[in-house]
Structures are given as C-alpha cells and as structure tokens.
Design a protein with these regions (language model features):
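Local sequence-structure signature of Cys/Sec-based thiol-disulfide redox active-site neighborhoods
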Residues: 26-68
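Structural micro-motif
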Residues: 84-96
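Non-catalytic, surface beta->alpha helical segment in thiol-disulfide oxidoreductase systems
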Residues: 96-123
Length: 123
C-alpha cells in the first residue's frame, strides 16, 4: 500500500511535537518535586568530587538546580565546611529530613524514597 509522503511527514511532526510537550511537562513536574523537597526541609549534603552525589543529582536532570543542596567541601581545598562539621557529615550524599528528624548517610536515594521520606508527590 502506498502512503502519501505528506501524510508521513504530518504524522512525524505530530509525534515529535507530542514528545517535546511531554518532556516539557515532565521537566516542570520534576522541578516542582525538587522545590518541594526544599519546602519540606529535606536537604542533600554533598561534595563536588563525590560520584554518588553526582548520581543523585543526575536523577533530577536539569531540575537538580532546584534541589536543596549544601556543598560540604570548599572547592580546591577539600576542607570540610563548618556547617557540615557541626552536622557530623562524614559520608556523602547525606540527606537530612528536618521535619521527621530522619537522616540517611552515604546513599543515593531513589525518587520514590525521597517522596516517601519527604511527603512530596512524585512527578
């Protein structure tokens, strides 16, 4: 069966536009989720050289910029900041959930785990 090339192009355009719209909507939801963590006083403490911290941030993609994040190491020195010394942050990432008093040291948390601990709705 022969299909008109214009129909093929039209279908392709609709599919591409749907994918872009879906991605933008998902990104906005992930932005909201990251912001909610901050509102619920769930804070990630990390270090710029920490692979697991990068892995944690990567779960959020571009939305990582909205994560409540505290850098525990002064860049270029590897000296631990006073705030992180006071909180006894020894392994990163460390998540502290102020509202519940929970603390998880040295573990990458899934979005599901972050949702359960914080009360923020998953996107």
């Amino acid at each position: 069966m022969h299909v008109n090339p214009l129909i093929r192009v039209g279908v392709l355009v609709v599919v591409c536009l749907s994918a872009v719209t879906f991605s933008a909507a998902d990104k906005a939801k992930l932005d909201d989720f990251a912001r909610c963590l901050g509102q619920k006083k769930a804070v990630m403490y990390g270090a710029f050289y920490c692979d697991h911290c990068k892995e944690q941030k990567d779960l959020f993609g571009d939305s990582a910029q909205y994560l409540p994040y505290v850098e525990c190491v002064e860049k270029g020195t590897r000296k631990v900041t006073e705030q992180c010394k006071t909180l006894a942050i020894r392994r990163t990432p460390t998540w502290i959930f102020e509202e519940s008093g929970d603390r998880i040291d040295g573990k990458v948390l899934s979005l599901q785990e972050l949702s359960q601990k914080s009360g923020c709705r998953l996107p």
